[in-house]
Amino acid sequence: MIRVATAECFTHGKVAREIHAFSMGYPLNYNWKISAELVLVAGLFIPTLSGVRNILGFEPPMPRATINDIKVYGEEEDEEVALMMARAVRELADSDIGIGTTAGIGRGGIAIASRDRWDVINSEVHADLRYPDTERILERQKSGIQRALQLLESFIVDFKDR
């Protein structure tokens, strides 16, 4: 059984929902290409700086902007923070794999971390949370969910091959 935990911002906990539904035998929107025994240990939606500090237990870098305590980073910082989130939630939930997502300005950061491997990618859609364009924000979210689950599948294949 592979244990997975998520700490999500721009994907709004939807990566966790997809993983849980798949693990229980009723996949939602994602077309899974693997067969693996997974369990979602925890799925956290953490868009704020205070959530990162108080729940994930680390001090995040200073964002370019904040909107009601919601962190707004550039793409490079999003990648860094997503990896920090993935590592922190993996430790917090005592899981095999942690997933972190965050997006402010740009394509966002999507990170997956195990004890000995990590990777960071982006969505395929650029958006800017400071000047919300609902359609672009939702397109970026959809792309981020898809890309996170694809990356998880590659991790699981590698995990099972060990």
Curated annotation (Swiss-Prot):
Report the superkingdom from the record. Archaea
Name of one Pfam family that matches: HcgF
Disulfide bridges in this chain: none
Q: Which family does it belong to?
A: Belongs to the UPF0254 family.
Which HAMAP family does the record cross-reference, listed alphabetically? UPF0254
> Which NCBIfam families does this one have?
PRK00962.1 (NF002122)
Recorded protein name is UPF0254 protein MTH1148 homolog
Task: Identify the species of origin.
Answer: Methanothermobacter thermautotrophicus (strain Winter) (Methanobacterium thermoautotrophicum)
Taxonomically, what lineage is the organism?
Archaea, Methanobacteriati, Methanobacteriota, Methanomada group, Methanobacteria
